Structures are given as C-alpha cells and as structure tokens.
Amino acid sequence: MASALQRRPSTRIFANKNYIVKLKSEFNFKTVEARRWISKTIEQERIYNIYHPAKKWFVILSDEGGIIANMMPILEPLHITCETANSDVLIDYLSSINEHYFSIAKQYDKRLDLGLSNFAIDNTGKIFYLDDDLYQWDDFTAFGASVSHLLLKLNQFDEDT
C-alpha cells in the first residue's frame, strides 16, 4: 500500500497492512522544539477537522535531534478508488473534497492540495485529507487547474452522467 501513496522526496514512509508512518526528515529540531511544533500542529489539525482522528504525531529521538513523524491507519487513497468506483460515488467524493476545500479557504484563508492522492477514504466511506500541509490561498488559481485535471483524468463519466 505504501507504494500507492504519493510523497515528498524528504518524507520517508513505512507501512504495514494496518498503519502508515511518515518521517518528516526536512524537520530536525531539538527535542523541545519538535514537541512544540507537534503540539501546535495537533491543535491546528483538530481545528481544521479534515484529518483522520487516529492520526498521531510523535518525535523520534536521534543524535542530531528530534525527527518529527506521524502515524495513522492505512486508508484507501482516492486516486486508487477512482479506478473502480462508479461515477455517482466519485461525484459524492469530489463533493466532499470541495466542501473541505471551501471550508478551509473561507475560515482560514488557506487551501488544500486537490490532488486525488492527497485524499483517502476510511472503511465508512468518509474522506480525509492526507497531506500534512495546508497552502497559502491563491485566489482559486490552483483550484481551476485541479478541477480541469480531475475532469480530464476521470474517464468514469459517461454521457448519461
């Protein structure tokens, strides 16, 4: 499953059949700073309410300092789901993604990365954001490009939809 996940080059991913762990090697703080960073991130993620509730942040201690990491259950990435889901299900998922996107934009003046690999579905069908980052608001520039890309990519839509 880890091979189906997209990632930054500086992020190391480890997974088994139940959990995924992401090591954020671009961050290497002193232990105290790492814990502060994690506390702030946990609080922000709680407020945003777009991340899986079982996602946990932690610090791995090394000789160089504290490496920030997180762990969460394995979810089905949306770009994989799109390969087999029918168009009605896809429309529901895209609607949920847009709700998340516009809620974050309106409330926090930030944007999500709308790439399908940044979203995943739990076993109840609920969508969660996987990217650990939110991005500066860009007046819908990325949104337009993302929607165009999605429409071209999703060959699930037929003439009856």
Predicted ranges, named:
Residues F14, S62, D122:
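Acidic surface patches and DE-rich sequence motifs
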Residues V89-L112, L116-F119:
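Conserved kinase catalytic-core segment
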Residues N18, S25-F27, W37-I42, Y48-S96:
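Conserved structural core of kinase catalytic domains
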Residues M1-I42:
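ATP-binding glycine-rich loop module of kinase domains
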Residues M1-L5, Y48, Q107-R111:
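Short, solvent-exposed secondary-structure boundary motifs
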Residues K110-D160:
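Catalytic activation segment of kinase domains across protein kinase-like and atypical kinase folds
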